[in-house]
Amino acid sequence: MALPIDPAAIDPDEYGEQQTTLAMDHDEAIERVREVCLDNGFGIAVEFSPSELLNAKVDADRDPYYVLGACNPAMADRALDATDGRIGALFPCNVIIWEEAPGQQRVYHLSIMKIARLLGLPTAADEMDDIIADTGEMVEAVFAELDAD
């Protein structure tokens, strides 16, 4: 299948890639990321462990991998308005924690707001730019705090 764009040509900043590494065990990292998200204006709307699910259902033997579905309701409400509701297909803003090695956890995030813009979902471009700036500041604060650990 030929893609209409070359993914390698897109700067990671255009889709809001953020990542860091935490030197702690997996469960501690999940708790730390949850705490930092809450401290910076995000609630956790949903969370689950794909590794536990896959290991149980298809004997995948995956290392620990966890999804925290972060959400700031005010931002989500604005984004729904700015996209005529279509951004809901991307909700929530996921923060992923996976074990790279014992005692070493990768924390990873992509901006659904920036991805929505790349996909052409916004019907209110100026408002979406404001939402991207606002949520970007919040996510940067999360990763700055995690980087300080």
What spans do the regions from the language model cover?
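Acidic, polar-rich N-terminal leader regions of halophilic archaeal proteins
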Residues: M1-D149
